[in-house]
């Protein structure tokens, strides 16, 4: 079939504070890490040997996924870091450099490899992508999606000849300057020989360094225009929007956990909710061991994680409460992501608990 490579060593700075204590692939959607959906998708398509490069907060990825047997796959990890004055510090080697490190260590990439970023949700037909890659005799392929011209400035744009051979790239061009509307999705198919072009023991990037080499040497390097759901979580605003879509049921293969107690309202085990004294309008998920007090209002799409406490008269509108978040009496949160330590609005503006610059108050339900 093929092997898999999940790129998971980045710091995730654009989605802070969500990644303050988590690697980006561990950011949750419906209570599951982003990367879990990727592994499940790879397994469904028969890709069972998967390497993951890790750096920041790497233990959280490794402890959660282990050897991959829970998903019917084999997972391996390649840590990227340095020893600095007695401390081991994360130091990513770049997307291509990280793959070359694995190849130098074991020669793992001995057949076609599907390369994925660990921070996106996809439903790509992997079998069809592999077939096209192989039928063209490609050394490397980039999976692309057609995007509206007025959105090209948000993407890396791929410029091809008529038969799909890649001629050049444009990084986030203005609409009037864009030579195509084919956006790179960060999904690649590589033959082992591609990694021979990557220098050993150097920081090296796939998009900005490896791909220009392939173009300059006129190697068999193709774009595939495919039609599939690709949900990239590059910013906090993307994360909020994705959760809204998922809760509304607009994303395939994303099943709401818990028991549906009334249309559009799902609850976990051991919840304390006086249904005749609260207002809850779905779609809403309320996690296990959560308490909702009389007079509280929750308007969906909303996700209330496990162990939360929404106090009397509080209002939560189109928001996400991470686990163990407490919302005080009569406090109002609208289109926010709230954890016990911080809250962030849909545009990424962040407040930390205890700051005096806002009227908003919240806390840790365990305290």
Regions found by a protein language model. Name each.
Residues 259, 265, 270-278, 284, ...:
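A structural motif detector for beta-strand N-caps
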Residues 14, 60-63, 101, 125, ...:
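Phosphate- and divalent-cation-binding pockets in alpha/beta enzyme and binding domains
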Residues 216-301:
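Extended, small-residue-rich solenoid/repeat segments and analogous flexible loops
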Residues 112-114, 121, 127-134, 147-150, ...:
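Catalytic-core segments of class I nucleotidyltransferases/pyrophosphorylases
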Residues 62, 70-161:
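Conserved beta-loop-beta/alpha segment of the NTase-like Rossmann-fold superfamily
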Residues 1-63, 73:
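N-terminal glycine-rich phosphate-binding loop and ensuing alpha1 helix
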Residues 341-367:
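Long terminal segments
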């Amino acid at each position: 079939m093929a092997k898999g490579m999940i790129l998971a060593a980045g710091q995730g700075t654009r989605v802070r504070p969500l990644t303050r204590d988590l690697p980006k692939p561990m950011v949750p959607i419906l209570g599951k890490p982003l990367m879990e959906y990727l592994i499940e998708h790879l397994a469904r398509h028969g890709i069972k040997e998967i390497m993951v490069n890790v750096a920041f907060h790497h233990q959280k990825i490794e402890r959660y996924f282990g050897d991959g047997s829970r998903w019917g796959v084999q997972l391996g990890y390649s840590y990227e870091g340095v020893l600095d004055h007695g401390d081991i510090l994360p130091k990513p080697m770049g997307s291509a450099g990280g793959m070359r490190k694995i190849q130098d260590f074991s020669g793992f990439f001995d057949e076609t490899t599907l390369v994925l970023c660990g921070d996106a949700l996809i439903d790509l037909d992997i079998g069809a992508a592999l077939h096209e890659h192989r039928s063209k005799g490609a050394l490397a392929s980039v999976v692309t999606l057609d995007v509206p011209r007025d959105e090209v400035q948000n993407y890396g744009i791929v410029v091809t000849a008529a038969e799909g051979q890649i001629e050049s790239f444009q990084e986030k061009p203005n609409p009037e300057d864009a030579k195509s509307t084919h956006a790179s999705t960060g999904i690649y198919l590589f033959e082992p020989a591609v990694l021979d072009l990557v220098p050993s023991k150097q920081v090296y990037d796939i998009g900005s360094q490896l791909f220009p080499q392939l173009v300059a040497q006129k190697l068999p390097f193709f774009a595939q225009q495919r039609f599939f759901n690709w949900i990239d979580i590059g910013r906090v605003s993307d994360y909020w929007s994705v959760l809204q879509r998922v809760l509304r049921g607009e994303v395939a293969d994303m099943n709401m956990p818990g028991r549906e107690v009334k249309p559009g309202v799902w609850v976990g085990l051991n919840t304390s909710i006086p249904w005749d004294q609260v207002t809850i309008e779905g779609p809403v998920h309320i996690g296990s061991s959560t308490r909702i007090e009389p007079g509280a209002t929750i308007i969906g799409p909303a996700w209330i994680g496990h162990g939360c406490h929404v106090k009397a008269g509080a209002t939560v509108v189109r928001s996400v409460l991470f686990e163990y978040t407490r919302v005080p009496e009569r406090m109002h949160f609208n289109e926010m992501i709230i954890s016990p330590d911080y809250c962030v609005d849909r545009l990424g503006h962040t407040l930390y608990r205890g700051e005096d610059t806002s009227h908003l108050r919240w806390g840790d339900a365990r305290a």
